[in-house]
Amino acid sequence: MRDDLMVQQQVETVWQHMVGVICLNCTGRKQVKKVLPILFTVAPTPVHFLNTPANTVKNIIESLGMVNIRYNRLKRMSNDFLTWDGEDATMLHGIGKYGSDSYRLFYKHEVPDNVGDHELKRYVEEEFYDLHPN
């Protein structure tokens, strides 16, 4: 993955976006950018993820820390994703304000109120300045 782009700018699907959000929690983007391509080769979709042995996924994400917690969040989110209506991202397990804001920006092309994350703020300023000036 390119270092000059956000993780969210380099994934192929909404599900992969949500995986990236969970992987970014309590870790650095450089670590995540090394892990995601490997994970998405093994499990490119939620169905593939749910059918991949837990130990395989855990070995891939181990370097991100909190491996059991992170794996359980990914598994529950992937299961939720299969029936999610695509509206409110916080309805997916493990997805909070950051995940919701980034989903709205990158997939719904909406600028959320009170974006808190500094990288998302920078993206809003660069890409949506005319829509939401500071």
Model region roles, listed by residue range:
Residues 114, 133-134:
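C-terminal interaction modules of eukaryotic adaptor/scaffold proteins
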Residues 1-86, 134:
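N-terminal polyanion-binding entry modules of DNA glycosylases/AP lyases
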Residues 16-23, 74-128:
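Catalytic DNA-binding helix-loop module of base-excision-repair DNA glycosylases/AP lyases
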